[in-house]
A protein has these predicted regions:
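Intrinsically disordered, glycine/charged-rich C-terminal tails and inter-domain linkers
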Residues: 2-7, 19-29, 35, 39-102, ...
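Short, leucine-enriched amphipathic alpha-helices that occur as contiguous helical runs
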Residues: 10-14
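Short gly/ser/thr-rich secondary-structure transition/capping motifs
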Residues: 102-107, 204-206
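Catalytic NTP-binding/metal-coordinating core of nucleotidyl cyclase/transferase enzymes
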Residues: 106-190
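Catalytic core of nucleotidyl cyclases, primarily class III adenylyl/guanylyl cyclases
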Residues: 160-187, 206-259
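Amphipathic alpha-helical transducer elements in NTP-driven molecular machines
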Residues: 188, 192-195, 260-267
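Serine endopeptidase catalytic core focused on the charge-relay Asp
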Residues: 198
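Alpha-helical scaffolding flanking metal-ion-dependent phosphate/phosphodiester catalytic sites
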Residues: 224-228, 263-266, 270
Length: 325
């Protein structure tokens, strides 16, 4: 019984420390208020950070091409992802944000398709009204917020089997591989569920923290399309300078890959048709979904002066659909 009381007290103390820390209370003040050492406070905070990293998206965040063979919404814990985003934004606003997203997996995947055409689902995430943020926030604050935002978006995209192609200012361009020819359902539904989770994380994870700290809230528009007219090209080399164990300089050359194609152009263009915190999909993505998933979309009636893309298979204006909620 005494042991249970002790564990309960320690658990309560731990949660109190984390609550105070997440409320931007310095560790030395927490130590003083709770009458424990600052080192113990910092150890508890660090242990929680490591635990969150393990429990968050890491278990499902390797963008291995084979992940496109699975329905990943069932294994992504959106509640943990939201909590992770809250903690990350808190930490970013208090100190230098971390950005540890590796591009090695992207290069490995693209190397397989170099100098060839490949079927891909393209997902484009664009931050709404970033010009207003630039005009209202100091550059260093805006940079910190965008960096934390981008990291969380990258993690959730990877959790759904996507791979970051590149960052374009305030936008993210990602792709999902189609592992079985003409089997579009899984990569398309993973991209759609990813888009829905991105919006949830922004609304329920990032924005509450920004609001509590007096910063403007964020919103995004997302476009998703799929197609087989995507060429993987190599544009030169990235030169990497490193030191070996003996402090001798080593120079490594890593090929720089990019994707060019109609699908990328359509996905980026259709993003502008979405309302804030909504996403749009092309006809081919919509057709790949089941009836229940289709019911969450409505067709967008867009004038030819705004939208004039022609479907490669139909020869008529390519239809786009918007998420309802």
């Amino acid at each position: 019984m005494a042991n249970e009381d002790f564990n309960s007290t320690k658990s309560f103390q731990r949660q109190t420390i984390l609550n105070l820390y997440n409320s931007a209370i310095p560790t030395e003040i927490i130590s003083f208020q709770l009458d424990i050492s600052q080192e113990e406070v910092e150890n508890i905070i660090e242990d929680d950070r490591k635990e969150q990293e393990k429990l968050s998206l890491k278990g499902a965040s390797s963008p291995d091409a084979s992940m496109g063979l699975f329905y990943l919404d069932a294994v992504v814990n959106i509640d943990l992802a939201i909590k992770h985003a809250q903690n990350s934004m808190w930490e970013a606003l208090k100190s230098e944000p971390k950005f540890d997203i590796s591009m090695e997996e992207r290069d490995t995947i693209l190397e397989k398709f170099a100098k060839s055409k490949v079927t891909l689902v393209i997902l484009h995430v664009d931050l709404v009204d970033s010009t207003r943020l630039l005009m209202t926030l100091p550059v260093d604050r805006l940079s910190t917020i965008i960096q934390a935002f981008t990291r969380e978006m990258s993690l959730i995209i990877e959790a759904y089997g996507g791979c970051i192609l590149k960052y374009i200012g305030d936008a993210i361009l990602a792709f999902f591989t189609v592992n079985i020819k003409d089997e579009l359902y899984l990569p398309c539904v993973n991209a759609v569920n990813c888009a829905r989770s991105v919006i949830k994380i922004i609304q329920n994870g990032i924005n509450p923290i920004l609001d509590q700290n007096g910063y403007p809230e964020m919103s995004v528009r997302i476009g998703i399309d799929v197609g087989d007219q995507n060429a993987v090209l190599q544009y030169g080399w990235d030169i990497i300078h490193t030191l070996d164990n003996n402090k001798h300089e080593q120079i490594m050359k890593r090929p720089h890959y990019d994707i060019m194609g109609y699908t990328v152009s359509v996905a980026v263009k259709m993003t502008g048709l979405a309302k804030p915190n909504r996403f749009v999909v092309g006809q081919l993505v919509y057709d790949a979904l089941d009836e229940k998933q289709k019911s969450a979309f409505k067709v967008l009636n867009v004038g030819s002066d705004i939208w004039s893309y022609v479907g490669s298979r139909t020869g008529v204006t390519y239809s786009v659909y918007s998420s309802i909620a």
